[in-house]
Amino acid sequence: MGASGSKKRSEHSQGLRERLLRARGGGYVKQRNASGGESSQSQEGSGREQKSPSCEGQQYQQGEFMNTPWRTPAAIGQKNSYKQQNMDDVDSDDDDLVGVPVMPRVPLREMTYKLAIDMSHFIKEKGGLEGIFYSRERHRILDLFLEKEEGIIPDWQNYTHGPGTRYPMYFGWLWKLVPVDISQEAEEVETNCLVHPAQTSRYDDEHGETLVWRFDPMLAYSYKAFILHPEEFGHKSGLPEKEWKAKLKARGIPYSE
């Protein structure tokens, strides 16, 4: 039974990368790294680099983090709007979501630390996210895919604010967002299209950076988002309210009173 379930999951997941790439263009493009050199992103995945730590799973609680669209009671309308947007995406982008069931295949459940670890490695092994340009549309596709295929409630995928590397705010999710400089050759040849994510990603981002997903297994052991930016967790940060609000204000990050 286990092998059969694993096979079915593998078959369903193989189309995730294709759906993401069809969302306004591909993700294979030359990029400039921090040292000034160029690198091309391959579409092949690899196996796990490290085993998941033996830790107790952490469950999501409403209001726990800062940038989920519905973290406060006052944002219920935003939550409903976000869910409606996911539904609209299915209607408007059917070609991008071929094979995604309308209803979840399994009962709905909250994301946990262990589940985030497992899903991160599973997606990596299938070549899912590595080097793909981030966009709001692709963010929703990933949410929708894991909701319909794995029953994971889409309230977990959140990243720290920029500029710079954006770390996942859900401990256990091993994919971070890294800003890249697109090479001139890539812009002229491969991404000479206004709707390509290499072009639109910078407009999605408030800091004007082009972001790509990168797998980082060390995020299973180090809660980078909380270590580097505790103020983004608000009351959960353990900081005095005046202090975390002052830090958010200094960084230009909005917060609810």
UniProtKB/Swiss-Prot annotation:
Residues 1-70 are annotated as: Disordered. Residues 1-10 have a biased composition (Basic residues). It is a lipid-anchor. Residues 11-21 have a biased composition (Basic and acidic residues). Keywords: AIDS, Host cell membrane, Host membrane, Host-virus interaction, Lipoprotein, Membrane, Myristate, Viral immunoevasion, Virulence. One of its GO terms (cellular component) is host cell plasma membrane. InterPro entries: HIV-1_Nef_core_sf (IPR027481), HIV_Nef (IPR001558). It comes from the Viruses. A lipid is attached at residue 2 (N-myristoyl glycine). Factor of infectivity and pathogenicity, required for optimal virus replication. Alters numerous pathways of T-lymphocyte function and down-regulates immunity surface molecules in order to evade host defense and increase viral infectivity. Alters the functionality of other immunity cells, like dendritic cells, monocytes/macrophages and NK cells. One of the earliest and most abundantly expressed viral proteins. In infected CD4(+) T-lymphocytes, down-regulates cell surface expression of CD4, CD28, CD3, and MHC-I or MHC-II molecules. The N-terminal domain is composed of the N-myristoyl glycine and of a cluster of positively charged amino acids. It is required for inner plasma membrane targeting of Nef and virion incorporation, and thereby for infectivity. This isolate is from a Gambian case of 'neuro-AIDS'. Homodimer. Interacts with host CD247/TCRZ; this interaction induces down-regulation of cell surface TCR/CD3 complexes. This is Protein Nef. It comes from Human immunodeficiency virus type 2 subtype A (isolate D194).
